[in-house]
Structures are given as structure tokens and as C-alpha cells.
């Protein structure tokens, strides 16, 4: 059986099932912004500022450029093959089944870990919001065991509950999902703009000096962690993860050839502008070294420095909404990739079951929703978040390389959108991805290799034998042999 058997565009489109098509350009843009703006601003800017200083804004730009080049490649694939599955389906088209499975396996971990990691940050802001009203959860129920060495905790109850609520919303239909996301994203954007307008008056340009205290890439005495613009970009790259999930909505999108490219590129553009403005203001208000005091809630720290306590409750609410939309889009993308892999026979049929009433992959959505909820509730996964980055960067590399290959092997295939500047654009995307991967620590590589190995075991032990494409090809070959013998 061929490990690199491929699907054609016609096969991918013909196999798509009638999920309800309701998504338009506005909905896709909101979906992308919902996935991108959240953890990056409200959690990672603290660690990023300590790593790069005020040059964190450049780190965000570097990560955005990488995502922008990769986004153009995703957009071309999405317009060429508007199906669920995102990078998994595109890899099946360009490089064949084994590569597709590896990328799908990789994305499942990426989406689950990001949602679980964000649920931990969500819990922190939720507890702060409760404290503002004089309410307190039992400390044992505020975080997973081992999250805070100074406090005994056992279970992240708020994070567990919010993941279950999001899973329920996702399971009952795309209309409910998009309405919920659209409303939350608009509220989140309004709160971010309010913060910018209020905080900009407290900026002290002297806090931007030196602008890049650690340069491009360096090590500090006594530390194994790299510092500088590139390592910070590798950290905040986590902030941009999610725009690729927009392409997973292809089978629920009206006129996907046009609306998907617009949604992906608009969401990236809006998010990048807001990230750069926010980081410049935050490092202008608070000297970058002082973010060590506010590592878990950097935006709240900026508000504390300004003395605008009235704004704290509003921003905490914005953080909660922002991280809720991130989790929603990640769990949405994960369920659609599992749905596509199940349809291809690489995962059990259970994950491909479509609910008759809601027209959603109901069982698969709940399976991974529960898994993510329990992971975020019981496991300290903060040490694993860089796995999300290396997994996503790997997917970006495959998709970008796929565009190069498809332009060479199928130059005349219909494309509703053509990435400009090919072959330069995908090559630059690949180069930037490798630059960001170089900024990750070695433990991340080891963990990624372990997950990769587990995926190969699943593929050769289960998926290869049950591949729908493989069985179809085998049946066709057997029929030819039988006809020859007759």
C-alpha cells in the first residue's frame, strides 16, 4: 500500500458532506480575530517583554510576517480546495497520506494544548474578577496541581467549566457558534480600544530606552533561556495561532473561494496592528524589567501603574472574553480536522458522526471537549505550551512547501486566489518558520519527537489499514486483476 497516495481536488470536494453553510466574510474575520487576539495580549506580553524589552513590538511584527506569508499559502489552498481539514487536507492533496496524517495528528495536539493552556489563563483572570467583587473560590479549585509552587491547588474548576460550556455551544450548531463568537469579539475589540485610548497618555518614552536591550539573539549569564527579538517572537508566535482554523470552516462557508481568503487576511491584518500598538503602549507605561511582577497578568499590571482602577474590571472582562473566543476557535478547528480524518478512515467513524438536527460532528466535538477540559483541569500544562508553537510552525512549513509543489505539478488547477510572489512567498514563509523554531528550547523538540513517534504508531497500527483511499485503490486493483483473469 502506498504511504504517499494522494487525493485530487475533485476527490476532496466530492467527499465533503452537507454541513450547514452560513459563514460570510464578516463571520470568518471575527472567527480569525477571535482565535488570534486573547492570550497574546493578556498573558504572553509579560514574558515577551522580559525576553526582548520594548523591542517586543518588533517580535510581534516578525511573528506576524511569518504568519502573513504562511497565511497567503493557506489562502491559496483554501480557495483551491474549500473543505474541512485545513493543513491536513492540503497535505493530503500535495504530499500524500502519511504526511497528511502526521500534520493532522500534530494539529490535534496543537488545538487541544492551546485550548487547555488558555483555560488556565482564563481561570486566573476569572479569579481576579471575582476578587474585585469580594468573592473567592476555594484556593484548591483555582488551578491544576503543581501550577503554583507557593500554593496548594488540585483542580482548575473555572477552566474546566468554561471548556465544557464552549463545547456545548460548538455541538449545537454553527449558527450559535458564529453568533456567540461575533458578539464576544466585538466586545473584546471595544475593550482593547478603550484600554489604548486611556493608557496612551501614561506612556513615558524614556521607558523605551534601550529599545532592544538583548539584541537579536543572546544568552544571559546563568540562564539557559535565550533572550532577544527572535526568542520573544518564538514565544509570542503563540498569539497568532488560530488564523489557520479559519480554513477549517470551508464546508460551512458561503462562497468559500472568495470569503475564506478575505477572512484569513483581514483577521491577520487587524490583529497585527492591535498587537503592535498594545505592546508599544505597555512597555511605554511600565519599564520592561518590572513585568516580572506582572508575569501572569501584564495588562492588569499596566492598569495598576496608571492608577485607573476603574478600568481593571473592564479589562479583566475583556481578557475573559478574549480568551473564551480563542478556546472556542481552537476547539472548533480541532473537531473539524478530526471529522475530516474520520471521513478518510484514518480515525474511527465515531469522530465523523454528524448530528441529524444540529449538522455538527457532535460526538467528536464532545470527546475532545471533555478531554481538553480534564487536561486543563487536572494537569499543569504551562510547561507544554511551546509544543503548540513547534506543531503549528511544522504545519506552516508543510502548507508553504505544498504551494511550491502544487504550482509545479498542477499549474493549471483552478484557483480562486493565487498567493502573490510565488515562489518567493512560500520560501520566505518556510525560512521565517525555521527561524522561529530555532528560538524554541530543546525540551520542546524532545516532547514533539515523542508525540510524532506516537502518531506513527497509530498510523501504521490502525490508520493505514483502514484508509478509505487505500481500500478504494485496493478494490480497484483487485477488480483489474479479476478482469484480467477472466
Regions found by a protein language model. Name each.
Residues 20, 43-148, 227, 267-270, ...:
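Extracellular loop-to-transmembrane helix junctions
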